[in-house]
Amino acid sequence: MAVAGAVKTSGGVQFCSEFENDDSDFRRVVLLYVDGPFGVGKTVTAKTLMQMPNWRGCRLYLAEPMQAWRQWFGGADMIKEINEIQTLKASGKLECREASPVAVAEVQMTIAAPLRIMNHVIYNYLGSERCYSAAASGPDDVLFLVDRHPLAACLCFPVAQYLSGALEFGDLITLLSGIPDIPTHSNIVLMDLDICEQARRIIQRGRPGETVDWTYLCALRNSYICLMNTTTYLQRTSYPALLKEQEALTSATLLKFKRECLETATVPEINPSIDQTLFAILAFDQQNVHGERLKTVLSFVVQKLATVLKNLCIFYLPAHGLTPEACALKCLEFAETASSLTTKRAAIASLIDAVERYNADMGS
């Protein structure tokens, strides 16, 4: 056996020699998604964490599929395309109906594809085994960092596009209906940043197609905060109580929700009401032009959101004034208290191979 504690790094994988040679059958896995609006530092934080010595066991890093988004689909740059459409819509040069069905919704579904695919692969290896509560990390444990959760492309970004006027309601519902099922014990680190600092970073890095649209940045940030509020609300509210409160929502609730998401910086609530959650978008009342006509469809979307989001554990990381190292240390603190899974050693080996191939084909 090689010397314990020696580290080998390969393709987004870092593991101790103990892990490489130990034949015991099971490993504990902490699956930690790092997410948030673009430009808040999530990728830098995850990569910094991969290099820190604080975690004793194996570390895996699944990259954001930037190559896939910018090169895969017929040579089109999906990130550039969707930002250009939103810019044209904001300037009044493109009507929402022109932009939405053939452009924003379609591009957003394309962006979601690699995230959905790999999420399915991950849970093929990890989802069928026993679940464990939090425990201090040991040399046999695996920390699996994933850059973006599928909910980013299937929920948070579409909600922001709808709130800022680039996506129509029917197209939003189409995207929400495609949210993948998420097993229990899924952990998300939600990174947040002052919008002015976020805009400065976006301009400074100068990625092709990325623009600073203040309305959209505000809507996107608040869609993530409302995701956290929704999860908190669901963990405190029974499903019958949710349905009762949902039926009481009005078009006035929706208008207030839109206004606040576009104009103010919302904060995660300890005990959020339903009008501070994403359910506020799905008001059923007859005054809402969408509500009565789509009531049956909306009821299924409410059920889907309730089932999926209740399973999440979200850790909030305000990154204002923090270095990448400080953010990475916070992520490690979250990992020590996060719920975890166990899976067989052979499954981990297969997962490592899948991660390396995914990063080579799709990663940034």
Curated annotation (Swiss-Prot):
Pfam families hit by this protein: Herpes_TK (PF00693)
EC number: 2.7.1.21
Keyword line: ATP-binding, DNA synthesis, Early protein, Kinase, Nucleotide-binding, Transferase
GO BP, sorted A to Z: DNA biosynthetic process; TMP biosynthetic process
SUPFAM superfamilies: P-loop containing nucleoside triphosphate hydrolases
Active site (catalytic residues): 64 (proton acceptor)
Coiled-coil annotated residue ranges, if any: none
GO molecular-function term, one example from the UniProt record: ATP binding
Residues involved in ATP binding: 36-43, 201
Domain of life assignment: Viruses
Catalytic activity: thymidine + ATP = dTMP + ADP + H(+)
Residues that hold substrate according to the record: 108, 207
Function: Catalyzes the transfer of the gamma-phospho group of ATP to thymidine to generate dTMP in the salvage pathway of pyrimidine synthesis. The dTMP serves as a substrate for DNA polymerase during viral DNA replication. Allows the virus to be reactivated and to grow in non-proliferative cells lacking a high concentration of phosphorylated nucleic acid precursors.
Family classification: Belongs to the herpesviridae thymidine kinase family.
Self-association and partners: Homodimer.
UniProt-recorded name of the protein: Thymidine kinase
Source organism (scientific name): Infectious laryngotracheitis virus (strain Thorne V882) (ILTV)
Lineage start: Viruses, Duplodnaviria, Heunggongvirae, Peploviricota, Herviviricetes
Gene name of the encoded protein: TK
